[in-house]
Regions:
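N-terminal binding-site loop/beta-alpha segment at the start of enzyme catalytic domains
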Residues: 1-86
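A short, structured active-site edge motif that brings together acidic residues
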Residues: 83-96
Length: 96
């Protein structure tokens, strides 16, 4: 049930949907987080977004101190590789 068209990203060859899924809140509870998030619901949300045609997810190691990236990874492992969205992540902090 793909419902989104794509657009080329700048001069690259990447074709992206106009909107993606922001995964900050999926990081859950921690000092700078969004409060408790249910991982099962987060995984279902990611899978639904991909089923609807979104083809990129924004996450970062700082979102839940890596928890967001872990949940995104768990959600994507059940999606065939050819149907997986792009995952854009970033880093900036070092923590022990």
């Amino acid at each position: 049930m793909k419902t989104f068209s794509t657009r080329r990203l700048g001069k690259s060859t990447l074709e992206l949907t106009p909107i993606g899924l922001g995964a900050w809140a999926i990081g859950g509870e921690w000092r700078f987080g969004w409060g408790h998030q249910d991982d099962t619901e987060s995984i279902a949300t990611i899978k639904r977004a991909v089923a609807l045609g979104l083809n990129w997810i924004d996450t970062a190691a700082i979102y839940g101190l890596g928890h967001s990236e872990e949940v995104v990874g768990r959600a994507l492992q059940d999606i065939p590789r050819s149907e997986r969205p792009y995952v854009f992540t970033k880093c900036s902090l070092v923590w022990d």
